[in-house]
Amino acid sequence: MLTLILIILFSCRIYYNPSPLFEEYKNYRNQKHELELVQCANTDKKIKQLLSIYLDKYQGNRIWIIQYHRGINDYMCGSMRFELYDKQTKPIKYQYTDFNLSWYTLPDYLRIHDSFIGKLEEVDPVLSISNSAKYIICKLIRDYNNVSIGIFGISYLDKLPNKLLETDLQQDYIELQKLMLE
């Protein structure tokens, strides 16, 4: 009986004066959003630091990450979320914002083969013309459910490095993937 009375009193309080509950929920949502923004900024900073190390380590001209997302009309799209480049390379990040994945053959190739090392024109002639890279090393980024969420790539304007450290690249990719999934 006491429980019923408490429920009735609590219900009346909510019915006649719900604003404290709404205010509390709003504050909770705002705090949660702030924490997510801080975590995202920290993760992005760590990813940029890793990419800077990898750009030097693999002697690339550009290193980048394209992240997949749903576009305006619910088409599968991608955006170049991260791009670092050396002094002789021009940025291309803004050419790859909200583009439809079907415009290029590279995403489909990676969906089937998971990675690519070689001449860019062999896998995607359109990309080789539009961003001046002759060679690329790239790998599909997958989440923990094995769903494709993006592409990690290193671009070379003239030639691939003489010594490719494929085992290092695989280990570095795993480290980067963990950060992307934070």
What are these regions (language model features)?
Residues 43-49, 132:
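Short linear interaction motifs
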Residues 113-134:
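Signal-transducing coupling segments at domain and membrane junctions
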Residues 134-143:
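A short, aliphatic-rich beta-strand micro-motif
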